[in-house]
């Protein structure tokens, strides 16, 4: 950071692909609104099977929630594969001091650290041409490790309302899962309860994913919506549970404890 000569720090990951207008769009937003932090969209691409398409559809939904969360100031999220902030604000906030004990999540924690002081100066770059692209996880093991990593970093979030929302989503999904499991022992009443709750979840998810997939020109992913809904329910329950009880996972050759 000390060697950076520019006014604005822009970050992405080494395995990401950026678009021709990427930096221009970030610079334009910065010059227009002078925000203290800019979050921008990230998508997966080059999927080869339904498992990878599920990841892409799920991630596109996260981007929709990211934009809405920043706009409403209810739950501010970002991804280090596409964000920007002024060098001056990084120095003012003493960088990652106070959050550098966490193995993952420094992007989100820095955002929330800045938002605590400048709640009205956080922007989301709503432009598909500013999207950066990375690839999905190829195996179930790497997918679980990735999502456990995301889940465990929530313990360091400054904005506790985000944690409460995530817990609420997990509890609702777990309730559906329990209803389906209970129907095997206690009959059709639990099955109907589970189906009713699952239908509510699917309707809410469909409205979000239809809008965001269209916006990012990935309407093709909606062909896997029904299967993805089943995957999503199972993974939310399992990953939420694992993220709550463990700090251990593997990521890019490293074992995190």
Feature locations, PLM:
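Short acidic donor-binding/metal-coordinating loop in glycosyltransferase active sites
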Residues: 6, 14-16, 42, 106
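Acidic donor-binding/catalytic loop of UDP-sugar-dependent glycosyltransferases
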Residues: 14-29
């Amino acid at each position: 950071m000390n060697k950076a000569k520019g006014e604005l720090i822009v970050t992405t990951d080494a395995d990401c692909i950026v678009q021709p207008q990427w930096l221009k769009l970030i610079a334009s937003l910065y010059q227009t609104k002078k925000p203290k932090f800019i979050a921008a969209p990230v998508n997966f691409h080059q999927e080869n099977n339904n498992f990878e398409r599920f990841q892409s559809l799920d991630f596109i939904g996260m981007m929709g929630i990211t934009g809405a969360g920043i706009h409403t100031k209810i739950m501010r999220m970002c991804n280090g594969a596409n964000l920007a902030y002024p060098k001056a604000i990084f120095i003012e906030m003493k960088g990652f001091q106070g959050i550098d004990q966490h193995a993952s999540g420094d992007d989100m924690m820095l955002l929330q650290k800045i938002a605590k002081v400048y709640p009205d100066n956080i922007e989301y770059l709503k432009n598909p041409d500013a999207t950066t692209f990375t690839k999905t996880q190829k195996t179930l093991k790497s997918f679980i490790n990735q999502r456990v990593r995301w889940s465990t970093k929530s313990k360091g979030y400054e904005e506790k309302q985000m944690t409460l929302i995530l817990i609420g989503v997990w509890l609702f999904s777990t309730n559906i899962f329990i209803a389906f499991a209970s129907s095997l022992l206690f009959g059709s009443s639990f099955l109907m309860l589970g189906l009713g709750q699952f239908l509510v979840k699917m309707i809410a998810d469909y409205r979000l994913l239809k809008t965001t997939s269209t916006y990012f020109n990935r309407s093709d992913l909606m062909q896997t919506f029904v299967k993805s809904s089943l995957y999503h329910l199972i993974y939310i329950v399992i990953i939420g549970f694992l993220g709550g009880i463990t700090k251990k996972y593997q990521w890019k050759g490293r074992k995190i404890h």
